[in-house]
Regions:
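Bacterial signal peptide processing site
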Residues: 21-23
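Short, conserved charged micro-motifs
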Residues: 95-103, 142-145
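A short, solvent-exposed beta-edge/loop patch
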Residues: 79, 117-154
Length: 154
């Protein structure tokens, strides 16, 4: 009887732990709409920004020479400016790939990719919410953009 009761308590404990596990849900919406929300939430103007869809040819410029695949990506950078600024959103194939993707982006992205300007290493932010990853590089507004992105899940 004690064995049955012990097994039952263990089983209930496992169900409790699994049932209360944190599951991070994906952020819904088009990357274009989400990009606008990130800028607006950070209070950063995006009027003079150009958005570019990522493809196999331009991905190394925006993310570095990464090896992971993703469903879609969108980059936002100034059309013409002497300010180093880049925001990239990518939707991964699976949220389970987020940690690997963030690590690889952080290692391979070039914060000195512009001709006359650069972003300090401490102002390169790579975060994720579900299957969505942001790379924000900006010496003045990078942290605001990162925080705005993280608020998309709330």
């Amino acid at each position: 009887m004690k064995e049955v009761l012990s097994l039952l308590l263990v089983f209930i404990g496992i169900l409790f732990l699994v049932g209360c596990g944190k599951t991070e849900k994906n952020v819904e919406g088009s990357l274009s709409d989400l990009m606008t929300k990130v800028y607006d939430g950070a209070g950063v103007s995006h009027e003079d920004m150009e958005t570019v869809e990522l493809n196999s040819e331009n991905t190394p410029f925006y993310l570095g020479d990464v090896s992971f695949s993703f469903k879609e990506g969108l980059a936002s950078e100034p059309i013409m400016s002497s300010v180093a600024h880049s925001v990239v959103l990518i939707r991964l194939n699976s949220a389970s790939d987020a940690e690997k993707a963030k690590k690889e982006i952080k290692e391979k992205v070039d914060p000195n990719k512009w001709v006359c300007v650069s972003v300090d290493e401490e102002n390169v932010y790579v975060e994720s919410v579900g299957d969505l990853v942001i790379l924000a590089m900006d010496n003045q507004n990078g942290e605001k953009l990162k925080d705005s992105f993280l608020n998309l899940s709330k």
